Amino acid sequence: MIKINKVDVNDLEVLSKIDIDNFEDAWTKEMFKSELEHPNAEYYGLFNDEEMIGFCGGWLVSDEYQINKIVIDKPHQNKKLGQIFFTYVMQVLKTKGVKKALVEVRVSNMPAITVYEKSGFATIDIRKNYYKNNGENAYVMVRDFSNEQF
């Protein structure tokens, strides 16, 4: 059964493994630990029964949420889980009073861009040479919740 729960530093090992398995520029365990211990960190895990199969997280500062990581593990991709998960996280953020959510995404990552656009995000800027491992540009995308109804 699919479920979504908050995650924290106790989930460090599995978060790190999913990140390494899915990204060339994955974070180290130390980076994850620092991120998860930050007072503004809000991370959510997507679980299939007891197995974490994805996560989304970032910083909640005032009424803005900066998405730092979102991933669905490769064996579970292309099953609409990313869209369902991301939509749920956005609803949770709205209930917490978030007015704006921001994310940077590789310009080549069309699956992620599609999820973001279907979730109400729009591209507002391009960060040149944003990704250190290959110099790829990133789109800056934003969703403004301030005029949305619940």
Name every feature range the model reports, one short phrase each.
Residues E104, E117, A122-A138:
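Conserved catalytic-core motifs of GNAT/GCN5-like acyltransferases
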Residues A41, K100-R106, G135-R143:
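Conserved catalytic core of the tyrosine transesterase superfamily
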Residues K79, Q83, R127-Y130, N137-Y139, ...:
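Acyl-donor (CoA/ACP) binding surface of acyl/acetyltransferases
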Residues D73-T87, K94-K96, K100, R106-T114, ...:
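Conserved glycine-rich acetyl-CoA-binding loop
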Residues S34, S108, Y131:
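Positions that flank functional sites
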Residues V9-P75, F86-Y88, V92, K96, ...:
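Acetyl-CoA-dependent GNAT
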Residues I2-I4:
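Extreme N-terminal starter segment of soluble prokaryotic enzymes
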